[in-house]
Amino acid sequence: GLGLRYVQGIGSFATFDEFLHLTYGGARWSSSTRVLYSTSDNDFRFRNYNSKEFVTDDDGQIVGEYYPLQRNRNGGFRDLHVMQELYYTTRGGDRFSLAAWYLDSHRGLAMLTSDRNKSKQKQNTQDERTLRAVAGWERLRNGLKLGARAGYTYTDLRYLLKQDPEGKGQFVVNTDARSRIHTLFAKAEAEYALGEKWLFSANAALHQHRVRSGDLSVIGNNGLRADTLYRQERFELSAFAAVKWRPVPRLGVAADLRWELYGDRTTPVIPALFADYVLSKRGSVVVRASAARNYRYPTLNDLYFRPGGNKNLKPERGWTFDAGLETTLKGDARSLRASATAFDSRIDDWILWIGSPKLGIDTPINIRRVHSYGVEAKLSAEAETSGGWRLLLDGNFAWTRSINRGDPFSPADESVGKQLVYIPVYSAALTARVEWRRWELTYKWNWYSERYTMSSNDLGVLGRVKPYFMSDLSLEKGLDCKWASFSLKGCIHNLLNEEYESVLSRPMPRLNV
């Protein structure tokens, strides 16, 4: 039958969201159409701690100082998403699918708090148009599952920087970076279950990339537009095989092998091994462990992006190990699940984009070795009372160390032995939800410790993003009538009105709805 769902959202800072979902389901055919349209001025107020103002008396003597309240500048956006899916199932059980997704986005890139320009003097925008179309086929018979997909993706990305120092509306283009990316792809996969103890799977995928990217605003010595485009194509092929074996109900073992070809180069065979064992059926206590080789080759942007690409980059390679414990407790109308995992990863030639003082731009480099290790813990609980109340809780905590173990690039390089930039050492999140009849109350909380913004881990004014926590609260009520179902939902973001930045010099909104 036919289905219709429409959601209208209205929020702070002239934010409007509209979502429409149309569905149809028949004996053989089914269809799904989704449309999402979002707009916002995104001009929230914040206190600018990078711009100190001084108060003077009639004699010009400084008698006070303060940090001014300002509005977020050039941060508005408009996004349109359209997705169409069509499915057909034959009498023999084959399932064919067609899907297309389109994105049309226009976003202003908000000015940094340290930027002294006005909106009339500087405009930063990014426009993106992306089309992705995929055709697929699936079949499941006698324990054998087969599938194939093929498609095409096109992206047109434009970054535009315009400036008018006098603020008279006569903008001059400083940067007009354009990227057009074409990708053809195909994938075939198979999965076969041999009894209850064995499961075999394999897939092969290929991609053909074609990229044209550069700055169209550059003028050469002859007064004509310079050709800064990089034109690159690359063929990529990957093959993957896996086997899972459960010799006894308590023990499970799995092994993976992966191999890839990119351009005229190939990766080594990349193995991975997984195991899990039920220590105790009482409490469902399970211990898990894995070991995997890592290998990541540079992307076309890493190699050739202008300006900044590095054609001499080496691929990342290394090993990752992890081990953990999980338990699940269930009772009448309640359950509890907890897990803890420790991991250790050592990567050679880690690819990292950094600012180059010599070139004045960001460029990717290889760090000889990065050692990443830590612990992750998760907890979820659920309970239901005789009065119809339902309580749900999900939480997680992580301790992560990502240390540069490479060699210094110069005598002044203080990054060796330090935490990588923008990776918090501690982080945590919690979601609590209460449901009763058609009411739902949800509280979300997350926290991040300080993050370094300089590879030396200097704690100066511009050397870190301060720790912060966030609280969101929402209340939803469902309503039913003979011909439709409705819901009303109210949300409060940043409930405790926290002042914070997620990226240096880019403040985030305080309390808003």
Regions found by a protein language model. Name each.
Residues 1-24, 33-35, 70-75:
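Short strand-turn segments of transmembrane beta-barrel domains in outer membranes
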Residues 24-126:
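Periplasmic-side early beta-strands and strand-to-turn transitions of outer-membrane beta-barrels
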Residues 34-36, 40-42, 143-161, 278-280, ...:
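Membrane-embedded beta-barrel scaffold of Gram-negative outer-membrane proteins
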Residues 40-46, 447-456, 475-513:
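C-terminal beta-signal and adjacent terminal beta-strands/loops
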Residues 126-128, 152, 168-254, 421, ...:
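Outer-membrane beta-barrel transmembrane domain signature of Gram-negative proteins
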Residues 197-201, 205-209, 224-345, 431-433:
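Structural signature of Gram-negative outer-membrane beta-barrels, strongest in the C-terminal barrel
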Residues 246-251, 338, 342-346, 366-454:
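Gram-negative outer-membrane beta-barrel transporters
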